[in-house]
Curated annotation (Swiss-Prot):
Protein's gene: TMA16
Protein name: Translation machinery-associated protein 16
GO biological process: ribosomal large subunit biogenesis
A molecular function GO annotation: preribosome binding
Nucleus keyword on record: yes
Coiled-coil region: none
Any single Gene Ontology cellular-component annotation: nucleoplasm
Species: Homo sapiens (Human)
Keywords noted in UniProt: ADP-ribosylation, Nucleus, Ribosome biogenesis
Amino acid sequence: MPKAPKGKSAGREKKVIHPYSRKAAQITREAHKQEKKEKLKNEKALRLNLVGEKLQWFQNHLDPQKKRYSKKDACELIERYLNRFSSELEQIELHNSIRDRQGRRHCSRETVIKQTMERERQQFEGYGLEIPDILNASNLKTFREWDFDLKKLPNIKMRKICANDAIPKTCKRKTIITVDQDLGELELNDESSDSDEEMTAVA
């Protein structure tokens, strides 16, 4: 009887890869590379979603009558943004204050909110909080027309606004001059007191 034809894979056993071989190391590197790629992809998607939520809030709270915002107006809008969780925190505190409740409910959510508010407040009072460029009329118009598509985020111009931007430049200059004058007066007073002491010692 004729022998049954053997397939190409017939008789071939899958080789077992030694854990310390170069092939195993290559597979491990590829797996780590893929994991890192997926992690970066997820982090990027998360950042885009967070930016998208922020921009959506600002767009929903724009004054339809304004063609552009002043720095003072922008700072006032940012203050509203920084306090956007206030009502939710009040509700959480209310639930936690009710008797016969064991432990604090929504503790993790409360912690996340407070950390977010603290971080954004530090940015605003420090080097600045990044928001859509609503100070420029053309950029504001583009931002108003945004349809919440995250792929169109590069079309939206951003800029950093800090708390000091709400203070007019003239007020800042006056404050600096006043401080300089005070320092000058202190130096003069110190010099006069030193000369008085010297005269007393000579006498």
